[in-house]
Amino acid sequence: MRHPLEYQRRLGRALAYMARHLHREVTLHEVAAEACFSPYHFHRLFVALTGETVAGHQRRLRLERAIQQLILEPQRPIGEIASELGFSTSQNFAKSFRLFYGHSPSSIRACGDFTRVDQLLRQHG
């Protein structure tokens, strides 16, 4: 396949698939199949075009969604958010969150709005 638009269309299908499945971890094989590529070729293409692995991209999407939920649903238990986003435990979620953002989910929630979250994350990053 030599047509860039076809690559874009197929990559778009893979990205949409990942976004629809934030509630669980998806495998490289699943996402590659959705885009009609071999896992090897898809991995190379995905990293070249996005700068991320499939697992890294999905983790980032899940953690970005977590920030939205922490701010928009301040009364919702963090463990419930973690479970909905496919993390096996709230401790696993908190560890992933802290490694990615440099802050705990509760400290992000305490910011209260997206502007303050952005300021806090810029200090870290």
Per-region residue spans from a language model:
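Basic/polar phosphate-binding segments, predominantly the helix-turn-helix DNA-binding elements
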Residues: M1-R2, R13, E25-L61, A82-S104
